[in-house]
A protein has these predicted regions:
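N-terminal Rossmann NAD(P)H-binding glycine-rich loop of SDR-like oxidoreductase domains
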Residues: 11-39
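SDR active-site strand-loop-helix element
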Residues: 22, 47, 83-87, 122-128, ...
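Conserved glycine-rich Rossmann-like NAD(P)H-binding loop of the short-chain dehydrogenase/reductase
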Residues: 41-51
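Rossmann-fold cofactor-recognition segment
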Residues: 57-68
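Hydrophobic/aromatic anchor residues within beta-strands of the central parallel beta-sheet
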Residues: 61, 99, 122, 178-181
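NAD(P)H-binding glycine-rich loop region in Rossmannoid oxidoreductase-like domains
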Residues: 66-105, 113-116, 133
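Conserved Rossmann-fold NAD(P)-dependent oxidoreductase catalytic core, especially the SDR/UDP-sugar
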Residues: 109-155, 179
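Active-site Tyr-X1-5-Lys
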Residues: 151-182
Length: 186
């Protein structure tokens, strides 16, 4: 029986924490994967539709669609300790329907997998842009501010909906520690 403690690389000690990163082949995904990879407490698995050339040798990469059975199997067949979801498609060649299906449908499936397979921690990357730039906004917005970007910027609709899905998940799956990151650029 596992104590839940991570296994050091090459050791027979306690189990390493499995962190699944979506969007691992993207710029930010690579940075996060490499940072966590250097910590011997973590085992990194990535889900991305794109290949991940140059990945560290002990990082497992699944080149799959987030909505697929193969993606679900990553959660079903192995104890996942955390999900870092950064797998949002920004392909200008994709149709609105394709983007919606991938982004919103994929996020919905991932949250479903986390609830079904008892993933204790979920981090969803959003953006401060979901608040929408409005002249009546105060200088500093709180997390309680409404997400109004989709009203003026249709391209933001998927990201706003993903944020809403994660917020709803936060309240529905109270036993899962859920974090929504809304970084802002300077």
């Amino acid at each position: 029986m596992s104590s839940g403690e991570p296994v050091p690389r090459g050791g027979d000690g306690p189990r390493r924490k499995k962190v699944v990163i979506t969007g691992i082949a993207g710029r930010l995904g690579r940075v996060v994967a490499r940072a966590l990879h250097h910590d011997p407490r973590f085992l990194i698995e990535g889900l991305d539709r794109r290949p991940f050339p140059g990945k560290p040798k002990d990082v497992i990469h699944h080149q799959v669609d987030l909505r697929s059975k193969k993606a679900r199997d990553v959660f079903r067949t192995g104890e996942v300790d955390a999900l870092i979801h950064m797998g949002v498609m920004h392909d200008p060649r994709a149709t609105t329907a394709e983007l919606y299906s991938w982004n919103v449908g994929g996020t919905s499936k991932l949250l479903e997998y986390c609830a079904t397979y008892n993933v204790p921690k979920v981090v969803v990357l959003s953006s401060a842009n979901v608040y929408g730039p409005r002249p009546e906004n105060p200088q500093f917005l709180t997390e309680e501010a409404p997400l109004l970007a989709a009203q003026r910027f249709p391209a933001m609709r998927d990201l706003v909906e993903i944020d809403h899905l994660a917020s709803t998940f936060f309240w529905k799956a109270r036993d899962i520690e859920t974090v929504i990151l809304r970084p802002v650029s300077r």
